[in-house]
Amino acid sequence: MTESISERNRAAQALFAPLGESYDRYARLLSFGQDPRWRAFLVDRLETGPETTILDVACGTAAVSIELVRRYGCRVVGVDQSPEMLAVGRARVDIAGLGERIRLEEARAEHLPFEDASFDALTFTYLLRYVDDPVATMKELARVVRPGGRIAMLDFFVPAGVARPAWELYVRFGLPVLGRAVSPGWGEVGSFLGPSIRGFWDDHPVEEIVGAWREAGIDGVEGRRLSLGGGLVLWGTRGA
């Protein structure tokens, strides 16, 4: 791939790529079992049907892609920049018997290899923290969705109010300790996630991200904080 990759993007790929085989298991553990519930809420926002084709961006190990097919009976194209994650995802798709419904490809969200309005809906997870320009990325994502198609995202978030001190305690101390108990690689993830999440939302308040969606031509943007604010789902509809 010839396009330049941002340093934060490159660092995230180097951090997570070796963990593909264990990613889903320990993502569930480190999120206190909330990750599957968040994914289900994300998938439900699309409100689509069986005769649709959905693009799953930053698909990783294909967990969302598989859930989309099981929920809607649709077809899914999943893209991710990590060959290692895609290899795990393809194995999971085969085990699930969904190879005819799900196709996984290597691609980056900032430069999608698809024509305009190619998909009926789009999901992306844990993505915007790793791109240099959220507005440009949202425009690229919206470009490949037909007018009237749903777009939905999931990411970690920073709780407000009384939940904030507990969150800070967990990401500063709990996550690194739990990660190191699993493996050195997961220890690095545990130390990385808190500053990554906090730094992104400090630099890009949710109102700014919603503005990026609207600037990309996405209408009716809504959001829901999950698990006392530890997760965030945004969704909206591609305008005409």
Spans of features found by a protein language model:
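C-terminal alpha-helical "lid/dimerization" subdomain adjacent to the S-adenosyl-L-methionine
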Residues: 10-11, 158-212, 222
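Core SAM-dependent methyltransferase catalytic element
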Residues: 216-240
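Class I SAM-dependent methyltransferase SAM/SAH-binding core
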Residues: 53-111
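Conserved alpha-helix/loop element of class I SAM-dependent methyltransferases that forms part
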Residues: 32-50
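N-terminal, positively charged/glycine-rich alpha-helical extensions of SAM-dependent methyltransferases
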Residues: 1-22, 182, 186
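A short glycine-rich, Lys/Arg-flanked "PGG" loop and its adjoining helix->strand segment in the class I
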Residues: 135-150
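A short SAM/SAH-binding and catalytic strip from SAM-dependent methyltransferases
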Residues: 120-134
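A short acidic, Gly/Pro-enriched loop at the edge of an enzyme's catalytic core
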Residues: 110-121
